[in-house]
């Protein structure tokens, strides 16, 4: 059973007793090195029917890409992570009733991408795009799509951040990456996340979690087009939340980010 999520902004009254400290941090680091719970790249998409369906972005892993447990970069944590998040989203919001039987994978450049207000991508540090994919991603963002970029850092000789910045420069050359602080509406769209940077990353020695984004017209008062969870792997906590392998508080915090991202994408 999934643990309770926490307390949303003036809506719910879940209470979680948290034992923070060394054990929590060690559990977080250990979780990042665990084998995936469900190893598959088989895609069995549900047909579009208007319901909210979680969609993961597929892409070709770039040269030197990280094939974790023989999975291509886009598939890390698929589909356990998003299935767990959909259970929480269905249970706590009272508003969004997501499709529960399946989550989808849509490859960048597929016109189906535009059916999804929110998409999710892991390992953008290994992302490469051809010109058609670059245009498709640009059009998606400018037409109202919202992307969660998750699970990347600088490691194993890979400049994950540098690669991500270069790809986004190609997609939105006029755009400017900006750090997201606690005042950004994405951290208050459902749950009140008072200090996002206090989130404990499961990456050992990666430094503190960082959150970056781009806004329409580079104006922070306008719509946020994507959020990049750098030095972070929020979905790893979703994937393992019902196993007892990680402290409930860490999974709760990760779910708060996920729910907020979904709610923001549906209301902006």
Each PLM stretch: what is its role?
Residues 1-10:
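N-terminal secretory signal peptides that target proteins for export/translocation
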Residues 14-26:
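Bacterial N-terminal signal peptides
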Residues 29-118, 124-125, 233-268:
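Aromatic-Pro/Gly-enriched surface loop or interdomain linker
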Residues 36-38, 62-68, 154-243, 250, ...:
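An acidic, glycine-rich "communication" segment
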Residues 54, 113, 118-161:
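Short alpha-beta junction capping motif
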Residues 82-86, 134, 138, 161-165, ...:
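Extracytoplasmic/secreted envelope proteins and their assembly/folding machinery
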Residues 95-106, 149-153, 175-183:
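Surface-exposed patches in mature extracellular/periplasmic domains of secreted proteins
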Residues 145, 169-173, 266:
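Hydrophobic/aromatic-lined pockets within catalytic cores
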């Amino acid at each position: 059973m999934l643990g309770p999520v926490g307390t949303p902004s003036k809506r719910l009254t879940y209470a979680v007793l948290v034992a923070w400290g060394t054990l929590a941090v060690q559990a977080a680091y250990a979780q990042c090195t665990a084998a995936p719970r469900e190893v598959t790249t088989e895609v069995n998409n549900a047909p579009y029917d208007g319901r909210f369906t979680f969609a993961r972005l597929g892409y070709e892993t770039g040269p030197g890409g990280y094939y974790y447990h023989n999975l291509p970069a886009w598939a890390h944590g698929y589909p356990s992570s998003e299935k767990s998040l959909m259970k929480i989203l269905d249970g706590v919001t009272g508003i969004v009733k997501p499709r529960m039987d399946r989550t989808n994978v849509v490859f960048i450049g597929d016109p189906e991408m535009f059916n999804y207000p929110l998409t999710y991508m892991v390992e953008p540090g290994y992302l490469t795009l051809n010109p058609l994919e670059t245009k498709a991603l640009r059009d998606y963002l400018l037409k109202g799509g919202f992307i969660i970029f998750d699970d990347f850092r600088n490691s194993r000789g890979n400049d994950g951040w540098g690669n991500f910045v270069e790809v986004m420069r190609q997609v939105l050359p006029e755009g400017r990456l900006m750090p997201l602080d606690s005042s950004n509406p994405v951290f208050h769209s459902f749950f009140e996340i008072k200090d996002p940077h206090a989130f404990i990353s499961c990456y050992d020695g990666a430094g503190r979690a960082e959150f970056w984004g781009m806004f329409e017209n580079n104006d922070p008062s306008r719509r946020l087009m994507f959020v990049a969870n750098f030095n972070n792997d929020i979905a790893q906590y979703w994937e393992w939340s019902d196993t007892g392998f990680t402290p409930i508080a860490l999974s709760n915090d990760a779910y708060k980010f996920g729910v907020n991202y979904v709610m923001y994408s549906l209301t902006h």
